[in-house]
């Protein structure tokens, strides 16, 4: 392992969370010392620190909607050529405009909840701790407890099925509605135990039975898939020609969305097959940097089990995307 990357990993790991696929991400983005880069999901600054450390005359813009993450990132990036801004990555174009930056050389989005958020009981993301059922990344707006208390059985089942791919969505939703008529569901352990009681015993042997339900509620509370869909085109538009967009996902719904959008940008001619020559004149707006998604090495899997489901995809912009 490169000693520079190793030292960056050690610094990036300290005190907040361990950035996943760090080496693969840096290699995919091909950081130029004088380049301008944007980390749309700074978290505690793990990836951001590694990027900013490579800049000489360049600049990093680090965004996150979580005020806790912004404080941690600000401390970690102090003294480096980095600007830290509290904002959802869907607004990256507006942030860049306010900073007087027309386009950037590379963008990183590390989608999903951070290890710090999972490990902070009071944030209510984890079924391992007894805490308020919150799950808000921005610490404002509707909580998971609000959804559990107000949505109908059908609405809850739809969320569990769509965002968690939970095959026992209906019985779980039914149990929630019945339970809340007796007592409000306010904590993570209340919900986790209720889910566990709602699925067959065989389903409890394949990981924690509440995992998919918690994932689904988190996605719904934060509008994660809607945000990602909107951010993909915005991010591509913010790149210079030759700029690169790297995205790390942690579950199949996110990865499928990224894969599909990348494929759209890579599509060239759209003429019917029976046409002998191209008349549309379209050429690919992007080309793949990685032939297949990068995943964690055995070493990283040993050191950081949470990297198991991480996938990195990256494309390079050739020209502006087609908008029809």
Regions inferred by a protein language model and the residue ranges of each:
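S-adenosyl-L-methionine-dependent methyltransferase catalytic core, i.e., the SAM/SAH-binding region
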Residues: 1-324
């Amino acid at each position: 392992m490169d000693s520079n990357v190793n030292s960056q990993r050690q610094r990036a790991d300290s005190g907040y969370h361990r950035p996943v696929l760090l080496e693969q991400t840096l290699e995919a983005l091909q950081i130029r010392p004088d380049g301008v880069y944007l980390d749309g999901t700074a978290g505690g600054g793990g990836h951001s620190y590694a990027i900013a450390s490579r800049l000489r005359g360049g600049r990093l813009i680090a965004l996150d909607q979580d005020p806790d993450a912004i404080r941690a990132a600000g401390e970690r990036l102090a003294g480096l050529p980095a600007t830290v801004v509290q904002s959802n990555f869907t607004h990256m174009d507006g942030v860049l405009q306010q900073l007087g930056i027309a386009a950037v050389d590379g963008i990183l989005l590390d989608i999903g909840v951070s290890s710090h958020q999972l490990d902070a009981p009071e944030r209510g993301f984890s079924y391992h701790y007894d805490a308020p059922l919150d799950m808000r990344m921005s610490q404002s707006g509707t909580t998971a407890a609000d959804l559990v208390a107000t949505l109908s059985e059908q609405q809850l089942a739809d969320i569990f099925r769509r965002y968690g791919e939970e095959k026992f969505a209906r019985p779980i939703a039914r149990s929630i509605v019945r339970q809340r008529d007796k007592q409000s569901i306010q904590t993570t352990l209340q919900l986790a135990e209720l889910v566990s009681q709602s699925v067959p015993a065989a389903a409890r042997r394949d990981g924690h039975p509440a995992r998919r339900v918690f994932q689904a509620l988190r996605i719904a509370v934060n509008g994660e898939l809607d945000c990602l869909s909107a951010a993909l085109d915005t991010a591509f538009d913010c790149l210079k020609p030759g700029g690169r967009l790297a995205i790390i996902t942690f579950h199949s719904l996110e990865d499928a969305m990224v894969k599909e959008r990348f494929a759209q940008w890579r599509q060239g001619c759209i003429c019917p097959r029976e046409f002998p020559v191209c008349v549309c004149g379209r050429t690919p707006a992007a080309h793949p940097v990685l032939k297949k998604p990068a995943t964690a090495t055995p070493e990283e899997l040993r050191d950081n089990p949470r990297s198991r489901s991480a996938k990195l995809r990256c494309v390079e912009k050739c020209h502006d995307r087609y908008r029809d």
